[in-house]
């Protein structure tokens, strides 16, 4: 959502910011723009934002801001779909996550200016923007900048979203002990067929991404969607017993013991107004 100007300037002048700008420049236009036949879809960038809240009025006030001010304005700026997720298990509650996709880093950095020029947003966001320090809308925010895997280049909206059907989201973070190990794990998903195995056994992706900026690096993050917990267990059981997975996991240099130091799982449910 909102990026303070000083943080934006610091980011742009950093070495990492320059590298990401180069990546962005090479990524081209949105995937839904006209593409040459056979052209690859450029991977998206994601802002993954965590709001830490306290019980009381904060969850309702933040939801009002997101639903009535932020999400409509972000959609007008071309950022869609916006995912909003509430924690079911794995983290303290109340905690809210917001996923903002973008075709480029440049468009993410332009969000602040775009919102400030949007009169409808400024009116709808007034209770949020003018909340006093003694009664804030949230305790704090934490965010990560992610870049999508080339073989899962865009958010895949679950089929159940349109009908507001049941959706259990599973957010998984894989940490590695160094950059080489991290690249090896990413390669398993992007080049060695692990995502294909997921799909084959019924593990349905929402997104797969590398963490470019954020905590617990080097790491990758992905989200799956299930109908319910029983469906999740069935799909994971099928994955663990898959001959394809057993062969891949036994590849020298690619076992979890060699390249993954920690896996974190958080279960989420969609907010009523989530677009994912």
Name each region found by the language model.
Residues 20-25:
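Hydrophobic h-region of N-terminal signal peptides that target proteins for export
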């Amino acid at each position: 959502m909102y990026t303070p100007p000083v943080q934006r300037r610091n980011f742009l002048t950093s070495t990492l910011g320059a590298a990401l700008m180069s990546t962005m420049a090479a990524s081209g236009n949105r995937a839904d723009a006209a593409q040459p036949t056979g052209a690859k879809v450029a991977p998206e960038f994601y802002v993954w934002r965590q709001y830490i809240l306290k019980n009381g009025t904060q969850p309702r006030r933040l939801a009002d801001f997101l639903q009535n001010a932020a999400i409509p304005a972000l959609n007008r700026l071309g950022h869609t779909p916006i995912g909003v997720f509430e924690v079911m298990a794995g983290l303290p509650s109340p905690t809210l996550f917001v996923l903002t996709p973008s075709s480029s880093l440049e468009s993410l950095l332009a969000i602040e200016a775009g919102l400030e020029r949007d009169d409808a947003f400024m009116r709808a966001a007034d209770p949020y923007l003018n909340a006093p320090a003694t009664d804030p809308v949230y305790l704090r925010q934490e965010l990560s900048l992610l870049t999508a895997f080339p073989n899962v280049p865009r958010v895949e909206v679950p089929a159940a979203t349109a009908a507001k059907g049941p959706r259990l989201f599973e957010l998984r973070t894989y940490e590695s002990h160094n950059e080489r190990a991290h690249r090896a794990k990413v390669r398993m998903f992007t080049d060695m067929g692990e995502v294909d195995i997921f799909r084959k056994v019924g593990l349905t992706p929402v997104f797969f991404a590398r963490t470019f900026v954020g905590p617990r690096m080097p790491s990758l993050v992905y989200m799956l969607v299930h109908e319910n917990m029983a469906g999740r267990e069935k799909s994971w059981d099928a994955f663990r017993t898959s001959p394809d997975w057993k062969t891949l996991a036994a590849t020298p240099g690619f076992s979890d013991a060699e390249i993954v130091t920690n896996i974190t799982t958080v279960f989420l449910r969609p907010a009523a107004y989530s677009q994912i």
